[in-house]
């Protein structure tokens, strides 16, 4: 019988919180009691000492020194002074021993209450999101797509004219693709919800409650030892007091930590309230296609998306596995440290280890959460991998209706498709972008005058920076900044004057801020007055403000942003639209998941560190970073046209070749600039370029980029995250990245552009692509591609890096081709 089996229900959580509050009140009462005992012992010892001093004033010397009374009294007064010292020592021992330990125990108990409440709430929120909200959203979308598919099917079957039938067929194919893809997402979501449900009720929640009970029992054991130590120190030798203390000692000895909560559990324990596990809702199939419930659909429409999903899930599983490994190492290390410290710690000092025990329990809980995430991804990977392995090297099965239509295709159409990507392949590569979602933006904000903005938004306010750092920031006489005093709740105006930094404390009285003379309702108004009037800060100093020293322009507060809706997802987290509160600038906000390990968060910030140094019209602009608290944000300009790959697939049919030449010229200009800065992008592709509303292309996604003085970067760690079909042979074989390897990727980007967003090597796996390229194979010329551009592609794909053109040459060549093209 324990917390994990008897208190899994929400009612159990409530009574646990009530119990924690009651125990904290009890501990506070004990602390006040002990503090009063220390105070009374000190006062009593002081009175005895004062009596001894009074007697030493000579009253006893009136009697002969040889008098027995005099000697007895002298001994009495001497022993009284000894008793005074003993009582004073007892009081100090009580204060530094039991009372200090009890205060530490109370702080740890308060922290445990807070940590438990936060972890319980987080587990419930994650369960509700995975098990209810996400599933309901997927089901709602499923029903809508099923209705659309059924309607498109009826229109297709009812169409009589060839033109109408072809148009209805296209719509039906698109609806089928979307339905099958969403069916797969729903299957994966149901599997993830099932695993999360199982882990929550069998591992996560019981583990949390088991950890809580272990810590409570450990605290009960520590409290027992504190009380025993208190009674030993405060015990006196009188028979009456000894009897009382024996009773109290017996009461303290009756404390049994392992049985402390048995009565509580008998009174409040209840059966676990486990809701039914989610299952595939077969009613979703009533209006749509005859799909198998709980089974992935793998056919010619979904094979690419299933392969991509498997790659994505495999990457996420690798990150999750790494997280499990790290947390297992952390738990093992903490357990070993705790064992070593227990061996070297006196039993009465166990309270000193309580903080580490809580850290260990939190690490164990974190390990269970990581194992749950790993299990969900493992289950999804197995579903996807089993389906693809069952397919084998053969072609994916056709959709029955499309197979019938394919038999009726005329021989002339087949000849027209010879040497080109099949119509179905083009359809699949274009269809993902046909219904590109349009995202909304947060509304404009009312702009606030600079002087009316709060203190933390002022450019000259630097927060709690060290005083030593101020001297480095103040360069010229009259330079100033405002900072928060370290260790004190007051603000300081620091100014460089006559070669020395001067620091003036800003006085605050009656909600007015001043140095000398007139007061102002805010510090920004005070600084504005001193700047505009050039009034000396104080008559004695004669210091005048001249120039504000701004803080690092890249540092933003989370409060500086107004987040809009999610517009995408990256390797590290979600991407949102947003605005800057200061001037309504539209921004894109990349977030970093809080659960990522520190090394991955450092890789996330690598993009910002690189972009800080660059300014070019064809490089996406960095606006700032938010690192003051979690989650970490990278704030960049919002390029509203979206990514280049989706743009090609949705708008490509109406684009002229000259426009495409202008856009790849933009890409070449941006890469020429990066080449001049010795920056290696390593992930150049259409998906990582952005398009403005005026069709200007910008290079983006610098998460894999590196800056090397010699222009060569040697990578290690395998190919898990390498985009194989875009990567040069020397980078795949030897991990050698350079501007020349970026040139190879640029050749693939050219091919993507003039094939209007088709996938390179569409019928080859990553390994087959590597073997094909090593044997001298290259992509064919796209239908829309000018011959001069294809020759440039072939130069970019030279096997030897030294034989590839530089980006400067590529840019000049594209400009020349564009001028010649009509």
Curated annotation (Swiss-Prot):
- What outcome is documented for mutating residue 759 to F in this protein? Reduced autophosphorylation and strongly reduced kinase activity
Q: Where is the major localization of this protein? A: cytoplasm
Subunit info? Homooligomer. Interacts with BCR. Interacts (when activated, via coiled coil domain) with TRIM28. Interacts (via SH2 domain) with phosphorylated EZR, MS4A2/FCER1B and HCLS1/HS1. Interacts with phosphorylated KIT. Interacts with FLT3. Interacts (via F-BAR domain) with soluble tubulin. Interacts (via SH2 domain) with microtubules.
Q: Which GO terms describe its cellular component?
A: cytoplasm; cytoplasmic side of plasma membrane; cytoplasmic vesicle; cytosol; focal adhesion; Golgi apparatus; microtubule cytoskeleton; plasma membrane
* Native source organism of the sequence: Homo sapiens (Human)
Recorded protein name is Tyrosine-protein kinase Fes/Fps
The protein's UniProt keywords, in alphabetical order, are: ATP-binding, Cell junction, Cell membrane, Coiled coil, Cytoplasm, Cytoplasmic vesicle, Cytoskeleton, Golgi apparatus, Kinase, Lipid-binding, Membrane, Nucleotide-binding, Phosphoprotein, Proto-oncogene, SH2 domain, Transferase, Tumor suppressor, Tyrosine-protein kinase
Catalytic EC class: transferase
Q: Which modifications occur after translation, per UniProt?
A: Autophosphorylated on Tyr-713. Phosphorylated by LYN in response to FCER1 activation. Phosphorylated by HCK.
InterPro entries associated with the record? AH/BAR_dom_sf, F_BAR, FCH_dom, Fes/Fps/Fer_SH2, Kinase-like_dom_sf, Non-receptor_tyrosine_kinases, Prot_kinase_dom, Protein_kinase_ATP_BS
Bilayer topology: Peripheral membrane protein
Identify which residues the record assigns to the active site.
683
Resulting phenotype, residue 334 to P = Abolishes autophosphorylation
Q: What is known to happen upon mutating residue 743 to M?
A: Strongly reduced autophosphorylation and kinase activity
Q: Which reaction does it catalyse?
A: L-tyrosyl-[protein] + ATP = O-phospho-L-tyrosyl-[protein] + ADP + H(+)
Give the molecular function GO annotations. ATP binding; immunoglobulin receptor binding; microtubule binding; non-membrane spanning protein tyrosine kinase activity; phosphatidylinositol binding; protein tyrosine kinase activity
Q: How is its activity regulated?
A: Kinase activity is tightly regulated. Activated in response to signaling from a cell surface receptor. Activation probably requires binding of a substrate via the SH2 domain, plus autophosphorylation at Tyr-713. Present in an inactive form in the absence of activating stimuli.
Q: What effect on the protein does mutating residue 713 to F have, as reported in its record?
A: Reduces kinase activity by over 90%
- Region Important for interaction with membranes containing phosphoinositides: which residues? 1-300
Q: What does this protein do?
A: Tyrosine-protein kinase that acts downstream of cell surface receptors and plays a role in the regulation of the actin cytoskeleton, microtubule assembly, cell attachment and cell spreading. Plays a role in FCER1 (high affinity immunoglobulin epsilon receptor)-mediated signaling in mast cells. Acts down-stream of the activated FCER1 receptor and the mast/stem cell growth factor receptor KIT. Plays a role in the regulation of mast cell degranulation. Plays a role in the regulation of cell differentiation and promotes neurite outgrowth in response to NGF signaling.
Q: Where in the cell is it found?
A: Cytoplasm, Cytosol; Cytoplasm, Cytoskeleton; Cell membrane; Cytoplasmic vesicle
Further information in the entry reads: Cellular homolog of retroviral oncogenes. In contrast to the viral oncoproteins, the kinase activity of cellular FSP/FES is tightly regulated, and the kinase is inactive in normal cells in the absence of activating stimuli.
Q: Which family does it belong to?
A: Belongs to the protein kinase superfamily. Tyr protein kinase family. Fes/fps subfamily.
Q: What is its EC number?
A: 2.7.10.2
């Amino acid at each position: 019988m324990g917390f994990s089996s008897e208190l899994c229900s929400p009612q159990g959580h409530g009574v646990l919180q009530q119990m924690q509050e009651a125990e904290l009140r009890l501990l506070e009462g004990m602390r006040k009691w002990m503090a009063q005992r220390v105070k009374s012992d000190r006062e009593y010892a002081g009175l005895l000492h004062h009596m001894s001093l009074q007697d030493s004033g000579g009253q006893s010397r009136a009697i002969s020194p040889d008098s027995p009374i005099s000697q007895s009294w002298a001994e009495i007064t001497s022993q009284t002074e000894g008793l005074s010292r003993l009582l004073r020592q007892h009081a100090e021992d009580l204060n530094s021993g039991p009372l200090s330990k009890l205060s530490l125990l109370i702080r740890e108990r308060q922290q445990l209450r807070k940590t438990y409440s936060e972890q319980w709430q987080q587990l419930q929120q994650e369960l509700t999101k995975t098990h209810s909200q996400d599933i309901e959203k997927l089901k709602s979308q499923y029903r809508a797509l099923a209705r659309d598919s059924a309607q498109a099917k009826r229109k297709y079957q009812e169409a009589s004219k060839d033109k109408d039938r072809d148009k209805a067929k296209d719509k039906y194919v698109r609806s089928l693709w979307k339905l099958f893809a969403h069916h797969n997402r729903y299957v994966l979501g149901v599997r993830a919800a099932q695993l999360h449900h199982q882990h929550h009720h069998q591992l996560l929640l019981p583990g949390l409650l088991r950890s809580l009970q272990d810590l409570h029992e450990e605290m009960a054991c520590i409290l027992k030892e504190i009380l025993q130590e208190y009674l030993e120190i405060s015990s006196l030798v009188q028979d009456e007091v000894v009897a009382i203390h024996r009773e109290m000692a017996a009461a303290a000895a009756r404390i049994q930590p392992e049985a402390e909560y048995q009565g509580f559990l008998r009174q409040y324990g209840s059966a676990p309230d486990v809701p039914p596990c989610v299952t595939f809702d077969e009613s979703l199939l009533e209006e749509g296609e005859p799909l198998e419930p709980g089974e992935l659909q793998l056919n010619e429409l979904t094979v690419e998306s299933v392969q991509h999903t498997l790659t994505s899930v495999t990457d996420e599983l690798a990150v999750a596995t790494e997280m499990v490994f790290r947390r297992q190492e952390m738990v093992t290390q903490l357990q070993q440290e705790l064992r070593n410290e227990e061996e070297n710690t006196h039993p009465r000092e166990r309270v000193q280890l309580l903080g580490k025990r809580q850290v260990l329990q939190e690490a164990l809980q974190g390990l269970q959460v990581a194992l749950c995430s790993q299990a969900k991804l493992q289950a999804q990977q197995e579903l996807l991998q089993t389906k693809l392995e069952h397919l084998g090297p053969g072609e994916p099965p056709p959709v029955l209706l499309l197979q019938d239509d394919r038999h009726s295709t005329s021989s002339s159409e087949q000849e027209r498709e010879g040497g080109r990507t099949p119509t179905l392949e083009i359809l699949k590569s274009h269809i993902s972008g046909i219904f590109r979602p349009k995202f909304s933006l947060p509304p404009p904000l009312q702009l606030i005058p600079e002087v009316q903005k709060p203190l933390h938004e002022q450019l000259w306010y630097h927060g709690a920076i060290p005083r030593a750092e101020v001297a480095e920031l103040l360069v010229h006489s009259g330079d100033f900044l405002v900072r928060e005093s370290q260790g004190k709740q007051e603000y300081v105006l620091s100014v460089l004057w006559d070669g020395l930094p001067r620091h003036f404390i800003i006085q605050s009285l009656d909600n007015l801020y001043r140095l000398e003379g007139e007061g102002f309702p805010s510090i920004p108004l005070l600084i504005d007055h001193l700047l505009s009037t050039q009034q000396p800060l104080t008559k004695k100093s004669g210091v005048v403000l001249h120039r504000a020293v701004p803080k690092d322009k890249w540092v933003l507060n989370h409060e500086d942003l107004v987040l809009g809706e999610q517009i995408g997802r990256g390797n590290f987290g979600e991407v949102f639209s947003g605005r800057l509160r200061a001037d309504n600038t539209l921004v894109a906000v990349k977030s970093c998941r809080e659960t990522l390990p520190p090394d991955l968060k450092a890789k996330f910030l690598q993009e910002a560190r690189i972009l800080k140094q660059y300014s070019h019209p064809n490089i996406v602009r960095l606006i700032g970073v938010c690192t003051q608290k979690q989650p970490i944000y990278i704030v960049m300009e919002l390029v509203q046209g979206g990514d280049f790959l989706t743009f090609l697939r949705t708008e490509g049919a109406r684009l002229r070749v000259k426009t495409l030449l202008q856009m790849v010229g933009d890409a070449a200009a941006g890469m020429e600039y990066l080449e001049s800065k010795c920056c290696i992008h390593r992930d150049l592709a259409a998906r990582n370029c952005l398009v403005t509303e005026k069709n200007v292309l910008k290079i983006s996604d610098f998460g894999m980029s590196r800056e090397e003085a010699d222009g060569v970067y040697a990578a290690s760690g395998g190919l898990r995250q390498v985009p194989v079909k875009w990567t040069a042979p020397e980078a795949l074989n030897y991990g050698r990245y350079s501007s020349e390897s970026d040139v190879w990727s640029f050749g693939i980007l050219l091919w993507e552009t003039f094939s209007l967003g088709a996938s390179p090597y569409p019928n080859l796996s990553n390994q087959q692509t590597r073997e094909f390229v090593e044997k001298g194979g290259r992509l064919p010329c796209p239908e829309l591609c000018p011959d001069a551009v294809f020759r440039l592609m072939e130069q970019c794909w030279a096997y030897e890096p030294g034989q590839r053109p530089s980006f400067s040459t590529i840019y000049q060549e594209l400009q020349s081709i564009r001028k010649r093209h009509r």
